[in-house]
Amino acid sequence: MYRDNTKVVKIGKCVIGGGNPILIQSMTNTHTEDVAATVAQIKELTKAGCEIIRCTVPTKEAALAIKEIKKQIEIPLVADIHFDYKMAIMAMENGADKIRINPGNIGGTDKIKAVVDVARERNIPIRVGVNSGSLEKDLIEKYGGVTAEGIVESALDKVKIIEDLGYDNLVVSIKSSDVMMCVKAHELIAKQTNHPLHVGITESGTIFSGSIKSSIGLGLILNQGIGDTIRVSLTDDPVREIEAAKLILKTLGLRKGGIEVVSCPTCGRTRINLIDLAGKVEKMVSGYDLDSVSYTHLTLPTILRV
């Protein structure tokens, strides 16, 4: 599988790539400057099963807040940088375990080099992120529109910028809200780089549509052995992202644990309020992350039929 051959990258205490388990990420939707609110949400996400958290760092205050946030959380923190390279540097100086940038958005080579120099000094991985919504005009013209090929070329061009500066502690992400375009892009890039890949369907939507789009897209990608970390992007409480991501991994056989609730879809023979009962049971067992339940000399599968 592709993921068995990707480079090993250390993010805080976590290790990805090289066949290591796929880790689940999410992103806070608090103002990072609000340390108390951000820490509270990260702790809630950690309890739900989040293993890496990303926070936006648009201001100096947000970058400085990372130091205090890091003191109070247990999982690695990724600083999300959009345009100001100085925020990337400040975030790393204040304890970020990884930064996410699009080199095309933060300025010339001198600014990228300044970021890379600090990352190299502190051995902090850089996630090179490319989104179909911000694809360069020349690539749109070259491929006759926004395409998987264009997304991949854009990402690899940006990876090369950093590699040419002598740094390869990298993670790559290529995202699109078009599910099949995203799948194709990952199939293409997995053949052209051995950097670990962060996988997700960007702006996938609300809890219903977003979960369906993400399960199809991530399922098709992960089942080919592609992907080292994942995020299910939802317009909802970030905890729901973790719940969906865990279920996707379990369904693909890429993660164990928990109790699977199997229930009848109901029909005219049903004599109880099974819909309500199944929902209550699923909620009751949602916190159990056990591979199996031991009962005397038997080991029972963790499937509960309602």
Predicted regions mapped to residue ranges:
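N-terminal amphipathic alpha-helix/helix-capping segment at the start of soluble metabolic enzymes
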Residues: 1-25
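Active-site mouth loops of central-metabolism enzymes
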Residues: 22-36, 78-81, 140-150, 205-210
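Conserved, mostly hydrophobic/aromatic
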Residues: 24, 80, 128, 172, ...
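Alpha-helix-loop-beta-strand connector modules within alpha/beta enzyme cores
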Residues: 62-79, 118-123, 189-194
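Catalytic alpha/beta core domains of metabolic enzymes, predominantly
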Residues: 140-293
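Conserved small/polar residues in nucleotide/adenosyl-binding loops
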Residues: 296-302
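Non-cysteine beta-strand/loop elements that form the S-adenosyl-L-methionine
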Residues: 102, 125-133, 198-199, 255
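Glycine-rich, proline-tolerant flexible connector loops at the mouths of alpha/beta enzymes
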Residues: 47-68, 103-107, 170-177
